[in-house]
Amino acid sequence: MERLLIVNADDFGLSKGQNYGIIEACRNGIVTSTTALVNGQAIDHAVQLSRDEPSLAIGMHFVLTMGKPLTAMPGLTRDGVLGKWIWQLAEEDALPLEEITQELASQYLRFIELFGRKPTHLDSHHHVHMFPQIFPIVARFAAEEGIALRIDRQPLSNAGDLPANLRSSQGFSSAFYGEEISEALFLQVLDDASHRGDPSLEVMCHPAFIDNTIRQSAYCFPRLTELEVLTSASLKYAIAERGYRLGSYLDV
């Protein structure tokens, strides 16, 4: 049985090094999809590069943890900036859900202004869309707009019912991440999904060239290792050998 494999590179627009890495991993590797941060410092650069790479499917990386929001979010920002304190607010059940709903719509419209089309799908920076309080908002929005949504089904039991017309891959893996990146790790992710019987799988990745912005990230040099693995000719062969077809959320 042929299975669908979506290799999605997060953080398009984070920095020029990130952008170049994603384009390289698409052009000469197995990355088929990316998600863009519309408030990223290099988003205009990402838009420019994407024009020369029409085969790259582009979704939206909803941001609630970094940079400046597009709308006024006094309930989530500090000194006008988003940050990781969102976890504390979630634990205290103090998330400003109306502000988050408005910000989602604004980022979505900004994406369309930048790229001239709808995103192929939605996910989020640091997976915040999987918070039980936020997931229903994002799931409903994706279903209404007719676009797919990244779903990590492990914490989904706390996220409520899915809209009937919501599209997603059957499987999702964030395991291709960390200090031990290798071709063997990527293939283990595929084998695990095959054993579960998932007919479609998204694998998250972060290929990048190192620049000053990436150097400031807690996840730095493994991004370059990811790029090396994702552009390996032997990996593409091994994927096909396992019965996977490379595609995007447009195929879901």
From Swiss-Prot:
Signal peptide: none annotated. GO terms for biological process: chitin catabolic process; diacetylchitobiose catabolic process; polysaccharide catabolic process. Keywords: Carbohydrate metabolism, Chitin degradation, Cytoplasm, Hydrolase, Magnesium, Metal-binding, Polysaccharide degradation. It is found in: Cytoplasm. One of its GO terms (molecular function) is deacetylase activity. CDD domains: YdjC_EF3048_like. Its cofactor is Mg(2+). It comes from the Bacteria. It catalyses: N,N'-diacetylchitobiose + H2O = N-acetyl-beta-D-glucosaminyl-(1->4)-D-glucosamine + acetate; diacetylchitobiose-6'-phosphate + H2O = N'-monoacetylchitobiose-6'-phosphate + acetate. GO terms for cellular component: cytoplasm. InterPro entries: COD_ChbG_bac, Glyco_hydro/deAcase_b/a-brl, YdjC-like. Its EC number is 3.5.1.105. Its main location: cytoplasm. Pfam families: YdjC (PF04794). Pathway: Glycan degradation; chitin degradation. HAMAP family: COD. Belongs to the YdjC deacetylase family. ChbG subfamily. Involved in the degradation of chitin. ChbG is essential for growth on the acetylated chitooligosaccharides chitobiose and chitotriose but is dispensable for growth on cellobiose and chitosan dimer, the deacetylated form of chitobiose. Deacetylation of chitobiose-6-P and chitotriose-6-P is necessary for both the activation of the chb promoter by the regulatory protein ChbR and the hydrolysis of phosphorylated beta-glucosides by the phospho-beta-glucosidase ChbF. This is Chitooligosaccharide deacetylase. The gene is chbG.
